[in-house]
């Protein structure tokens, strides 16, 4: 089974929770070993720990890209194949192409690619996508200052509202 990372954005917390329930159902039934993988804490808006997730969340969800796309779309979200420029967990590395049977409008290129224009010039098929750039940070200390931003007055503009 190929593994790819997909970034998803949602118009509301409720929409994100709706999609998360579907993804959670597809995770393997493996208990987290905090001494190996660390704690998986639930936090409130004030960064207080409110509980811990017992199931290991680092595992791959057993679902196809198409299935996830349908989940995201039904929740009103945006589906973005992540770090398509990287050698791991990239749809381009795993499949060699971006499937055309999924209505993908956006892709994400990681901070690892310094010359995005050259990367895109070598791959004509990517020109048609909206490009997002992110730090792909998994830890707070890896987050970087924003190099780009979305010029919108309300989040609903991002979701066609």
Regions found by a protein language model. Give the residues of each.
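His/acidic metal-ligating clusters that form di-metal
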Residues: 64-69
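Charged catalytic cores and adjacent phosphate/nucleic-acid-binding surfaces used
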Residues: 1-27, 39, 56-57, 70, ...
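Surface-exposed cleft-lining segments at the edges of enzyme active sites
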Residues: 47-61
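Compact, glycine/acidic-enriched structural inserts
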Residues: 31-34
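Short, basic/glycine-rich phosphate-binding loops at helix/coil junctions
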Residues: 37-51
């Amino acid at each position: 089974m190929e593994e790819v990372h997909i970034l998803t954005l949602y118009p509301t917390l409720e929409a994100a929770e709706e999609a998360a329930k579907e993804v959670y159902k597809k995770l393997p039934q493996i208990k987290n070993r905090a001494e190996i993988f660390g704690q998986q804490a639930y936090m409130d808006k004030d960064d207080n720990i409110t509980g811990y997730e017992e199931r290991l969340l680092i595992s791959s969800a057993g679902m196809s890209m198409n299935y996830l796309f349908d989940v995201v779309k039904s929740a009103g979200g945006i589906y973005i194949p992540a770090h398509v420029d990287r050698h791991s967990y990239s749809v381009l590395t795993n499949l060699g192409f971006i499937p055309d049977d999924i209505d993908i409008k956006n892709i994400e290129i990681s901070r690892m690619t310094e010359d995005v224009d050259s990367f895109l010039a070598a791959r004509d098929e990517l020109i048609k996508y909206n490009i997002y750039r992110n730090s792909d940070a998994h830890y707070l200390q890896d987050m970087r200052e924003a190099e780009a931003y979305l010029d919108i007055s309300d989040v609903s503009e991002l979701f066609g509202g």
